[in-house]
Amino acid sequence: MQEIVFNALVHGVYVVTTRLEELVNGMTAAWVSQVSLQPLLVMVSIALPRYSHHLIKESGIFAINVLDNTQADLGKRFGYKSGRQVDKFAGLPWTTAATGAPILPQAYAYLDLKLKDTYLAGDHNLFLGEVVDAKILHPQNQPLVFKKSDFF
């Protein structure tokens, strides 16, 4: 019953990217939220065993790439397999943000973040990031919305 209600919650769809030296990875996420305006803080919830979890914790940087409503396939590309086994960036254009985190130039928008704090929340960690830079790349598009189990 509770899982059914949980699936009724609607979220945006994001690709959270990070970099640790030469290792780059990204994962699809829906549990992203604004936290504060002063300073500008955003959080993402990531399961403890995830490869991105390890890289963010070690590097202290990450970016949130906001997908648009035509990019469901991009969300699936970053959502189904672990970066431990697959290079999710193979063949994709990407740039580097001020922090060094990968940015997907085809995304609707991005936020470049420096890890400020980490909070254990059950089987996930909440990574609290301070915004270093943010930009809407394609304002003519609309953000992609996640329902039920589209990408996970």
Model regions: which residues?
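Basic, polyanion-binding surface patches
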Residues: M1-F152
